[in-house]
Amino acid sequence: QDVLEVGCGMGGFAARFQSIVNGVSYTAIDQSPRMVELARARGIDARHGDVQSLEFPDASFDLVVANWMLYHVPDLPKALSEIVRVLRPGGALVAATMGDDMHTELWSLINSGDATPELSFSAESGADALRPWFAAVERIDLHGATVFPSRDDVEAYIRSTMTRGHLVDELPHITVPFRARTTNSVFVAT
């Protein structure tokens, strides 16, 4: 089995996957040279790459993993066409993403109470994005919560987001630990 992870970040998922699944060849890519460096430090075969222009031959992988990253891609159809191109017949894409109501309790405190900004690939829109490219699409919903032990943790999380980091100063007084509901979905597309 040959696995490709696109948008591998620091390699945490890749390391965990390889520790519990034996006999796979695992390749990971990320656009950030720093993320590639950190993934390599974990022993991951990580390479600099762009999901919109994969540098692999057609039909190279049995599985492509895309965890919480497809909503960052400027041209989602191009990325999906590349994923389909490198998948072998019978292969699958497993893509995780968040729901539009992710951390509503937090975001309602800042930025005029807006929910999470609309994502190009979310729990709500993911199936529609995948259906033109795959014969079967299954959505598995995961509900939970993030518990932030301190205000510093909440602020650090806000700063880490691409769309809301600049709003950290709008955060009013909060009671900690602070709890925010999570909604995530995993899509399995074949």
Task: Show where each model-derived region lies.
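A conserved beta-strand element that flanks and buttresses the S-adenosyl-L-methionine
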Residues: 65
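Short amphipathic alpha-helix with an adjacent loop that forms part of the alpha/beta core around
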Residues: 56-58
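Short catalytic micro-motifs in class I SAM-dependent methyltransferases
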Residues: 68-69
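A short glycine-rich, Lys/Arg-flanked "PGG" loop and its adjoining helix->strand segment in the class I
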Residues: 77-89
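Conserved class I S-adenosyl-L-methionine
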Residues: 92-121
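Class I SAM-dependent methyltransferase SAM/SAH-binding core
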Residues: 2-53
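Local beta-strand N-terminus motif with an aromatic residue
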Residues: 61-62
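Conserved Class I S-adenosyl-L-methionine
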Residues: 10, 121, 128-190
